[in-house]
Design a protein with these regions (language model features):
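General nucleic-acid-binding
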Residues: 40
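Core domains of carbohydrate- and sulfate-ester-processing enzymes
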Residues: 44-45, 49-50
Length: 278
């Protein structure tokens, strides 16, 4: 409508317009991270599919994708989670396609904006929640309502930000100005990752040392169940939405090719970490 010239958010918030929109930021994991997903967007046909989606929705927008995020934690619980059965029936906060996945696993999902998560858990409206990372979670005060924080999850394991502009406004800019915005987005891609990885690490230390939070790695069995739930959700939506299926197929082609190389080539960095730090 032109009320704003530009905005900044995560693609998951497009979910109400089209489930396919969530595939551009919070979709299933095909062995890739947010870095490779952004590679698909920029070089694997993703941006063309996104523009096709925006056109079909009648949205007058131009978007750039940047800022690869580490996998989001499974989140905050009232006790240590050791298997998926413990989570069944829990009222759990998440958004986008992740809501479908966690529902499939037997949780009762409540979709809340970030600022309402901590009060909702404090009041008992929800039993557990995830938001994004140790820094944001700490800023929201999650350590005051839970002492059990679970890192690693496939519910939102590769997410990025979307910077969007009103298309009429963007098209009115000179070619030079348009390219400045495009390259600024690409520059932010690196700065975001470098800066925030350190922030998240510092705040995770603070959560443990200063606030007495117990930090766990989510069990592989839980993450395996998430992948199975993703399969069900993707198949169900794909059977009803040909464009959703088209995007998933494109992602799989890119991920299979790129990750075949990366997984064969990359050494086990965890092995080197343990060698030096135990």
């Amino acid at each position: 409508r032109g009320v704003l010239d530009g905005a900044h958010y995560v693609p998951a918030y497009w979910y109400s317009k089209s489930p396919a929109a969530s595939l551009f930021g919070t979709g299933p994991c095909f062995g890739w991270s947010a870095q490779e997903m952004l590679g698909w967007i920029h070089y694997g046909g993703g941006i063309e599919l996104f523009n096709e989606l925006m056109g079909s929705l009648g949205l007058n927008l131009v978007s750039f994708f940047n800022s690869p995020m580490p996998a989001q934690p499974l989140g905050w619980f009232k006790s240590h989670i050791t298997d998926s059965a413990q989570m069944k029936g829990m009222k759990y906060r998440t958004v986008g396609l992740a809501a479908d996945v966690m529902n499939e696993m037997g949780l009762s999902v409540v979709q809340l904006p970030g600022g309402e998560i901590q009060p909702a858990m404090k009041s008992g409206l929800i039993d557990a929640a995830e938001f994004n990372n140790p820094t944001s979670d700490k800023d929201f005060g999650m350590q005051d309502v839970s002492k059990h924080y679970h890192l690693a999850s496939f519910h939102q394991s590769q997410e990025c930000f979307e910077v969007t502009f009103n298309k009429k406004k963007f098209d009115s800019l000179s070619s030079e100005q348009q390219h400045i915005l495009r390259y600024a987005s690409e520059a932010e891609n690196s700065n975001f990752y470098w800066n925030n990885t350190l922030r998240y690490a510092d705040d995770l230390i603070s959560l443990k040392k200063d606030h007495g939070v117990n930090v766990y790695r989510t069990p592989d069995s839980v993450m395996a169940d998430q992948l199975k739930a993703w399969d069900i959700v993707v198949d169900r939506i794909s059977s009803k939405d040909p464009f959703f299926a088209k995007v998933v197929a494109s992602q799989k082609v890119y991920a299979k090719k790129v990750m075949d190389y990366l997984l064969l080539n990359q050494p086990d960095y965890g092995l080197a970490y343990k060698h030096h730090f135990g």
